[in-house]
Amino acid sequence: MNPDAKRLGDVRRKVTGIGDHTSHGGYLDGQLLVAMPVMGDSRFERSVIYLCAHSAEGAMGIMVNRPAGSIDFPQLLMQLNIIEKGDQISLPDSAETMKVLSGGPVDTGRGFVLHSSDYFIANATLKINDGVCLTTTIDILKAIAKGNGPKHALLALGYAGWRAGQLEEEIQDNGWLHCDADPELIFGDNVEDKYDLALRKIGIDPGMLSNAAGHA
């Protein structure tokens, strides 16, 4: 994770042209995207993505239901020299069990922490809505390791990005549905259940969707 606090704004500006968070009528900041069977991109099959930024210039989001391989949070802390081997036993439960997810195919070597709004670093934390923030500095990982971090958090490696107009086209082509974000769903422990939970939130029976996809 790059410790440069300015990178958060740089990433946001890169894909949206906006440096700070503002509300934009018609855009989907702070909503969930739920992939449909007609998506056609295996990288996003059955994915649930939290949209951190959306404007006329593009969009960026974090996938919240795809584990990042075999690495766990304590191993990542050791790789970043935040803790040493053997210190894992002294980590708080919140750090020991924190999820490490694949956030998307862009910048997969970088970490993005989605977290509850009870933790905030000036000039480093992006407030997306009243319940969810995004921080990309190493300071939040140190705080979590010490038990001083946010109440709810997940670490994602990489993010999903769309050029200007691309997300709108994919939604129009029925590749995505979207709905209001639910912090309990975003930060829930059962990663494998998030897709079905998101479908039910929209009002879709997951079984019916699976059957329809099988007969497409």
Swiss-Prot record:
Q: Pfam families this protein is in?
A: DUF179
Q: Out of the domains of life, which is the source?
A: Bacteria
What InterPro entries does its record include? Answer: AlgH-like
GO annotation, cellular component aspect = cytosol
Which NCBIfam families would you find in this protein's record?
Answer: PRK00228.1-4
* PANTHER family associated with the record: UNCHARACTERIZED PROTEIN YQGE (PTHR30327), UPF0301 PROTEIN YQGE (PTHR30327:SF1)
Name this protein carries in UniProt: UPF0301 protein BBta_6966
Q: Which organism is it from?
A: Bradyrhizobium sp. (strain BTAi1 / ATCC BAA-1182)
